[in-house]
């Protein structure tokens, strides 16, 4: 695979290899055949980051080869959304011959939605001033004149200039209902929107008919908790990043959901609060004991669950675990399988043509 060529003819084979690999990894814990969810074979990534290379008068996007660390010029990127590809061309054309926008520009980040909105961030090794803002506003207006619904942001050390706004609103069709998700620049969002829809629908399916409340750790912008709110009496969710919490609060209102409570704290802190080890001012007015959480949802970082959180989740009858790293999932299952068994197993091809796998398991108490 090269950045400008996807081996789409190999899609089925690479997916089949992942299924076999996941089954092998999960064999000590389950003999289930994974439910398999396919990605679009191209234009599936809704975000991308590129370094910018200055070559005489020329200017272009590059990425670095992971093995050799050599530079690879990238003029098109079929893994990314069609809107990102349009913007890549338009941004280079708009910046290449503009000394103010070009000088000391070293990276461009793109974030797009299925609803065809975009935030583009330009990163600089220099101070950004009013002249930069004026030129950036002219570029933004020129892009919009090309029917590109784009917001521009300039970033430098300790500086962030958002010309209009630093977010876009995604609209996802999930189980016959449109979900609105505010996505903030430089915050985590699911990279493959088509796969995200399938993950949300799978999570809804495995939790249908649920009793009681849902507890979610690492909720981000509320991606899963808002979609799952329909299946539970109440949802209590934690997230540490301020921009994500603010986006989640907006998303609760935008989707007219009244049974979700977001708390800004780390999973480890919440574990301490639940166990009565510490009290937190942030929890004033929230009666944790009133929640009857029969199900806990975790979507941890690549490092998986820490040992304290492992112990904490074992107290719940049902554990829904979305993993972006099956190796750490299996490490966690060494502990979780002592008290729970795997009821459902899914493979989500979030990153086609790469070694990476995303998977989901539903665990129920033995």
Swiss-Prot record:
PANTHER family: TRNA/TMRNA (URACIL-C(5))-METHYLTRANSFERASE (PTHR47790), TRNA_TMRNA (URACIL-C(5))-METHYLTRANSFERASE (PTHR47790:SF2). The keyword Transferase applies. GO terms for molecular function: rRNA binding; tRNA (uracil(54)-C5)-methyltransferase activity, S-adenosyl methionine-dependent; tRNA binding. Its EC number is 2.1.1.-, 2.1.1.35. It holds the Pfam family tRNA_U5-meth_tr. The gene is trmA. PROSITE patterns: SAM_MT_RNA_M5U, TRMA_1, TRMA_2. Belongs to the class I-like SAM-binding methyltransferase superfamily. RNA M5U methyltransferase family. TrmA subfamily. S-adenosyl-L-methionine binds at residues 190, 218, 223, 239, 299. It comes from the Bacteria. InterPro entries: MeTrfase_TrmA_AS, MeTrfase_TrmA_CS, SAM-dependent_MTases_sf, TrmA_MeTrfase, U5_MeTrfase_fam. One of its GO terms (cellular component) is cytosol. Dual-specificity methyltransferase that catalyzes the formation of 5-methyluridine at position 54 (m5U54) in all tRNAs, and that of position 341 (m5U341) in tmRNA (transfer-mRNA). Keywords: Methyltransferase, S-adenosyl-L-methionine, Transferase, tRNA processing. Disulfide bonds: none annotated. It catalyses: uridine(54) in tRNA + S-adenosyl-L-methionine = 5-methyluridine(54) in tRNA + S-adenosyl-L-homocysteine + H(+); uridine(341) in tmRNA + S-adenosyl-L-methionine = 5-methyluridine(341) in tmRNA + S-adenosyl-L-homocysteine + H(+). GO terms for biological process: tRNA methylation. The active site is at 324 (nucleophile), 358 (proton acceptor). It comes from Shigella dysenteriae serotype 1 (strain Sd197). This is tRNA/tmRNA (uracil-C(5))-methyltransferase.
């Amino acid at each position: 695979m090269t950045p400008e060529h996807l081996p789409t003819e190999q899609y089925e084979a690479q997916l089949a290899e992942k299924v076999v690999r996941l089954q092998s990894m999960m064999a000590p814990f389950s003999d289930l055949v994974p439910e398999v969810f396919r990605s679009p074979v191209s234009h599936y990534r809704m975000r991308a980051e590129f370094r910018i290379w200055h070559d005489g008068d020329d200017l272009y996007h590059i990425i670095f080869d992971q093995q050799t660390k050599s530079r690879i010029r990238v003029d098109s990127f079929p893994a990314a959304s069609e809107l990102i590809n349009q913007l890549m061309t338009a941004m280079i054309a708009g910046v290449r011959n503009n000394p103010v926008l070009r000088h000391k520009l070293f990276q461009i980040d793109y974030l797009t939605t299925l609803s065809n909105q975009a935030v583009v961030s330009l990163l600089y090794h220099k101070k950004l001033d009013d002249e930069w803002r004026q030129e950036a506003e002219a570029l933004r207006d020129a892009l919009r004149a090309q029917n590109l619904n784009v917001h521009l942001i300039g970033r430098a050390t300790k500086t962030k200039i958002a010309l209009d706004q630093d977010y876009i609103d995604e609209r996802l069709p999930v189980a016959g209902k449109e979900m609105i998700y505010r996505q903030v620049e430089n915050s985590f969002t699911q990279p493959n929107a088509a796969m995200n829809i399938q993950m949300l629908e799978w999570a809804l399916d495995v939790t249908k008919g649920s009793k009681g409340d849902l507890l979610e750790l690492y909720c981000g912008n509320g991606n899963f908790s808002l979609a799952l709110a329909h299946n539970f009496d109440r949802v209590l969710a934690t997230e540490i990043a301020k921009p994500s919490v603010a986006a989640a609060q907006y998303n609760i209102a935008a989707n007219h959901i009244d049974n979700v409570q977001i708390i800004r704290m780390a999973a480890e802190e919440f574990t301490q609060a639940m166990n009565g080890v510490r009290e937190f001012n942030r929890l004033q007015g929230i009666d944790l004991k009133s929640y009857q959480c029969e199900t806990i949802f975790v979507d941890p970082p690549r490092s998986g669950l820490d040992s304290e959180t492992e112990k904490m989740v074992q107290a719940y009858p049902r554990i829904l675990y979305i993993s972006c790293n099956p190796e750490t999932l299996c490490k966690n299952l060494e502990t979780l399988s002592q008290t729970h068994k795997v009821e459902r197993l899914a493979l989500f091809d979030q990153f086609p043509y790469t070694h990476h796998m995303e998977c989901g398991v539903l665990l129920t108490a033995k």
